[in-house]
Amino acid sequence: MAAYFHGNPPEISAGSDGGLQTLILMNPTTYVQYTQQDNDSNNNNNSNNSNNNNTNTNTNNNNSSFVFLDSHAPQPNASQQFVGIPLSGHEAASITAADNISVLHGYPPRVQYSLYGSHQVDPTHQQAACETPRAQQGLSLTLSSQQQQQQQHHQQHQPIHVGFGSGHGEDIRVGSGSTGSGVTNGIANLVSSKYLKAAQELLDEVVNADSDDMNAKSQLFSSKKGSCGNDKPVGESSAGAGGEGSGGGAEAAGKRPVELGTAERQEIQMKKAKLSNMLHEVEQRYRQYHQQMQMVISSFEQAAGIGSAKSYTSLALKTISRQFRCLKEAIAGQIKAANKSLGEEDSVSGVGRFEGSRLKFVDHHLRQQRALQQLGMIQHPSNNAWRPQRGLPERAVSVLRAWLFEHFLHPYPKDSDKHMLAKQTGLTRSQVSNWFINARVRLWKPMVEEMYMEEMKEQAKNMGSMEKTPLDQSNEDSASKSTSNQEKSPMADTNYHMNPNHNGDLEGVTGMQGSPKRLRTSDETMMQPINADFSSNEKLTMKILEERQGIRSDGGYPFMGNFGQYQMDEMSRFDVVSDQELMAQRYSGNNNGVSLTLGLPHCDSLSSTHHQGFMQTHHGIPIGRRVKIGETEEYGPATINGGSSTTTAHSSAAAAAAYNGMNIQNQKRYVAQLLPDFVA
């Protein structure tokens, strides 16, 4: 009798007749097969067992008495015969389908309580379950490929005897075909091995020792270099990288931003975009590595139990995570330095997550360029915001402006220049031509006009200074002439007062430029107001002092130049001039306020006369008095003791004759004779 079940029935029990043999196949694609010869040899070896003979007979006669739990199970054909598990009549109700499934798939049978009778599991049953191979899962713990190949070859050619049953001793020979059975014996032995726990503990100690050593080395390296921090748990490298130290990038970012050109700014922005791409690539590679490690961990846990892969994978995860974290921190530090050099805000947050992708970076860059272009321009709210921005790109404008200033004297590009500029800026030739037309009108022409105006102003200033200079010189010449006239006019008056009968020879010596229209008397001179111009007096005084120190061009000597060298006992030789005479001489002529007793050049004749009067007393020259023109009263010689003077015509005539008969050469000779006395 054949039965076919759709799906997965919860429990399979034998029929009442006890002759039903069933085979439970969880994976029909890996069913076990054997040939007719194997069946015959199996029947010959087990001929003493009647139950086994009945099973073989039923198997040969009823090839379709099987139960398939999969709807896609293949239909049996004449060339294939399946192994059936014989079930006796009294054991059919006690053994369930779960036990058969566990036996076929290599798991130890579970003790289940049945409603139909007691159930006992024989130790050989467990051994058969452990020795029955499972389907291969693609995992092997062997370290050598040769051993694995030898083991698989040994399993292919070595038959496995599975025996179960308490007293009947049914044996079924299962031969592994070329496709291989399910599972290697090594995995089943690992599960039931008593050395598994001890080996795992020993491996944990070795791995922990190595990890502690590596932690110490990494801490020492981080203290010296400062590039990598302490170890962090697995999974924090992608989320918490770059939090504490950023290495050389932070040092480079410590500098203050400087003014950058357009080319330098574009280069830094391109570098920043490349760094952001590298950062995303690093994160993607770490996620891929983490997924692969999770697959390995799940394979370990499936083979050796939950938590068994920690000893094998923890060290590798920590090492690789440290490398990824250091790489990410370095890239994040360089991005931060680029942001500071550009004067932008940091795009790396405090926890180290890079905020924003390449799209956000491009959007931020476009917004910044738009803000710079519209700087200082306030748009009315009624303007349409959706209207596209007018004007050429800033980079193209900078290139065109640079060419304009380089060829400022002739800003008319040729066709070749226009093609070259169009390639550099990415514009068309017509756009370049239009820009230069507008630039010459709006930029170049106003600059040229402004330069021309400044040049004209400078020329006007230069012409004004050149016209002003001759006028100033003429004014200064006139002022100097008037000053010289003021200086020379008192000399002429004094000479006239001193020499009323002089024929004019002394006037040429003193340098008078013209004769006065009328003669001045001492009374008129006394009535003139005193000039208080102290600046002209100071100039004249300095000039007089300079002339006192030198020798005159006509050979004469100043009277007062050597006056300070006389002895006190020699002062009696000079005449005594009254205070009125001094005042009259001081304030005479053009109101210049210069005293004539300071040693003016025209006083030489007077000094010589005085000296001649002292040396020649027999001539009867009156001392200390002055003869005025048209004065009828004549005075006689004055005495120093203050006595009265007698007026006689003889004395006046003698005085006039002596005055007119004076010789200038004799005066000079007399002065030359007195030089040794003055010097001594």
Swiss-Prot record:
GO biological process: polar nucleus fusion; response to abscisic acid; response to continuous far red light stimulus by the high-irradiance response system; response to symbiotic fungus
Family: Belongs to the TALE/BELL homeobox family.
Pfam families (alphabetical): Homeobox_KN, POX
Native organism: Arabidopsis thaliana
Name of this protein: BEL1-like homeodomain protein 1
Assembly behavior: May form heterodimeric complexes with TALE/KNOX proteins KNAT2 and KNAT 5. Interacts with OFP1, OFP2, OFP3, OFP4, OFP5 and OFP15.
Subcellular localization(s) per the UniProt record: Nucleus
GO cellular component, one term: nucleus
UniProt comment concerning the protein's domains: The SR/KY and BELL domains are responsive for the interaction between the TALE/BELL proteins and the TALE/KNOX proteins.
